[in-house]
C-alpha cells in the first residue's frame, strides 16, 4: 500500500526494502503508523541498513527462527542467531563468522571471504591458533544426572564435580576437544589440561569453522 516491500517479518519486527523510496520516506512511514496505534503502542524505527543477509533457520513445528546479519550506514554489524552471538561456540568460530560477514556485507567480496577462511583452516592444521581461541563454552541446562545423552560439556562437568567443584544448572563449562580416536566426550578436556598443540584441528574445521 505504501510502496515498501516486506523482506522479512515475525511477531515483533518487520524489515522493509525501500524499492525506490528514501530513508526519509521510511522514517515518515513509521511515524504515520504510530499516529494510528492505540494507547502506548509504538512502532520503533530501529535503523537503516544498506546491506544484509537473512538465513532461513527452521525450528520444526515452531517455524523459522531469526537468523540475520545487517550492516549499518556507519559500517557496524548487527548479528542475530549466528554463532557469533551464541555461547556454545569457540572464539575462533565467532571470529571467523563475524569476519566473513563483515567482508561480504562491507566489501561484497565473496572471494576474499573464501581466501580468509582457507587461511584459518591452514592455521588450525598447523596449530597456529592459540588454545584460548578453541575453548568452547557451554552452559549446563540441568543437573548432570538428568542428562540422558552426555555430550562433551556434561562429561567435563562431571570431572569438575569429581574434583570438588560446585557444578549445577547454569554453570558455564569450558572445554577443548583434543586429538585422538576415542569418542568426542572422552577427548574433551578442561583448558588447563590441554597442551598448545593438542587440540583436534579436524574437529574445529568440520564443526566450528
Where are these regions (language model features)?
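DNA-dependent DNA polymerase catalytic subunits
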Residues: 1-11, 16-209
